[in-house]
Amino acid sequence: MIYQKQDKLIKGLAKYYGQDLFDYLEALEKETDEIHEPLPCTKIKKVYSTELITPNFKGLLMDFVYEMVDDSYIHYEHYSGNLTHGNLTHTGRYDMELHEETGKPINTIIISTGNPNKSETECWIGKVNKYTPIRIIFLKKYPGDQRLKNVKIKIENNKKLTAFDILDLIFIPFLNTTRNSEEIVKEICGYVSKITKITTKQTKILTWGLWLTTEIFIKNPETLEKVRTMSTLK
């Protein structure tokens, strides 16, 4: 299922590229004119268990949780469709249980590939608790064409790629672009074989990320195999 593949992508990036992903998403948010409540802390201390063992939610898993250096917690939750009241109440109850378990402030960031104009952004849990995540990042709000052009220029000029460049190559197909996502993925895979200045960690993350994005957006098996072969990093 597409949702499961997108979910796996976000969780994997959160686990193996945590601080870079966190900083990248914060940088995306700053590109808009919207005013957001600042996060109390932006430095990750360690990964926290995603499993909640409680009488109400025994064995249920959150997508990803970080313990921050100020002892607060960042909770990532990903949804592939338009956000619904059910999505928000589900996430809000996770936060309530996580706060009960840790006794610490919980700040939730929802990442959505849905339509921001057709999504709910707050909900009531019960009759007295209004729930609004501190961040809802709708990837479709952010323009991707210029980002792709910028990374392409760096690759063609044999420039060293940053962590943000690597994440751009993975996330651009989910952003707002003038062409469809399948065409964007194919173009990106054509570029990456030309990359030479890249670290071992970046190579692993990019290879893994493109493996999933090609599977998400390319439906024809023969085309998928061809594109994956084309995207082999040197």
Where are these regions (language model features)?
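Elongated, amphipathic alpha-helical interaction scaffolds
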Residues: 1-234
